[in-house]
């Protein structure tokens, strides 16, 4: 039975890996990657809330005097 010639295998494997690497590089070169998101500048209008102009006091139950 003849023996299998394996002397060219490293060359074949190296060329295969190089070809796969180049094909993947060409494939990813054609892809479009979105640029990173940047914060959007927004004009914030001040809200006109009626309770901001009034003085209000919130009473908690613990601060009220005891009723007997």
Swiss-Prot record:
GO molecular function: proton transmembrane transporter activity
UniProt keyword annotation of Transmembrane helix present: yes
Membrane topology: Single-pass membrane protein
UniProt KW Transport keyword: yes
GO biological process, one term: proton motive force-driven ATP synthesis
CC terms in the record's Gene Ontology section: mitochondrial membrane; proton-transporting ATP synthase complex
Protein name, as recorded: ATP synthase F(0) complex subunit 8
Native source species: Symphalangus syndactylus (Siamang)
């Amino acid at each position: 039975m003849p023996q299998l010639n394996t002397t060219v295998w490293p060359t074949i494997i190296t060329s295969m890996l190089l070809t796969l690497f180049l094909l993947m590089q060409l494939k990813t070169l054609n892809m479009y990657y979105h640029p990173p998101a940047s914060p959007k500048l927004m004009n914030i209008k001040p809200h006109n809330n009626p309770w901001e102009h009034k003085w209000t006091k919130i009473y908690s139950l613990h601060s009220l005097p005891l009723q007997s």
